[in-house]
């Protein structure tokens, strides 16, 4: 949806690649920054990996993961890392543009799309504004046109730097509930579950019984992963009707679908 806007500023090449599973930030983004699969991160850098059942934030070690990849390839690139959650953060980034251009690599995480997805789930007003895929894309485009990020890209277009734009995962409008049973330590994501003794009778799921075969960490010896496919989402038998009414037609990620897994890459 942004390619035309960006194409007015730069000569662009568009490509596509496939996200890892789960299509969730904790796994997919950490894999991009480290250049490793989740199981490899947990094994090689246990201090940088946080399991699902831990209370600690799951994406607080992104800058160190970038550093591990640079060092692993025995490079000596200077780099910076920035996470933009609001216009104040974007303004700060723009103000320091001259200084940042001295680095070999600048990594910028822009959280707007993810925040819009979560806000649409939690806010009735936002759900009305972005009530389908077309409206969702329209809001994204409107945000970009009036954002500091557009100003930042315009400023960068006047330099000779190379820009790479991508994401860690997409999202899908979840409309079909699937019952699943798990213990109280099972994670809360609606598109994938990991835990012990997971039970789901639906054919619309993909099960990984041995996580190590998929290069995924296993907090327990009996841990398995269950992924929703298509437009399904998981709901527990307890409070089933509440889950269905609250989450039906919300945009979710973590599972298996083309919308979640096919990732754009713009350079």
Name each region found by the language model.
Residues 1-267:
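Feature captures the catalytic ectodomains and active-site-proximal regions of enzymes
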């Amino acid at each position: 949806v942004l390619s035309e806007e960006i194409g007015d500023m730069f000569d662009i090449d568009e490509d596509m690649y496939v996200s890892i599973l789960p299509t969730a930030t904790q796994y997919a983004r950490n894999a991009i920054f480290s250049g490793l699969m989740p199981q490899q991160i947990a094994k090689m850098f246990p201090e940088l990996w946080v399991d699902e059942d831990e209370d600690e934030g799951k994406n607080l070690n992104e800058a160190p993961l970038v550093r591990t990849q640079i060092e692993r390839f025995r490079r000596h690139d200077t780099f910076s890392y920035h996470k933009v959650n609001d216009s104040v953060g974007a303004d700060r980034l723009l103000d320091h543009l001259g200084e940042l251009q001295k680095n070999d690599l600048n990594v910028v995480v822009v959280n707007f799309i993810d925040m819009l997805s979560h806000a649409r789930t939690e806010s009735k007003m936002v759900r009305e504004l972005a009530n389908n895929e077309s409206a969702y894309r329209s809001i994204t485009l409107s945000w970009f046109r009036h954002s500091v990020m557009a100003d930042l890209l315009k400023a960068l277009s006047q330099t000779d730097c190379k820009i790479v734009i991508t994401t860690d995962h997409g999202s899908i409008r979840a409309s079909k509930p699937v019952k699943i049973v798990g213990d109280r330590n099972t994670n809360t994501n609606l598109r994938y579950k990991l835990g012990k003794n997971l039970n789901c009778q639906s054919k619309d799921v993909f099960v990984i019984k041995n996580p190590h075969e998929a290069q995924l960490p296993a907090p327990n010896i009996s841990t398995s992963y269950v992924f929703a496919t298509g437009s399904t989402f998981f709901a527990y038998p307890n409070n089933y009707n509440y889950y269905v009414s609250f989450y039906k037609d919300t945009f979710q990620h973590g599972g298996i679908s083309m919308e979640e897994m096919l990732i754009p890459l713009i350079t």
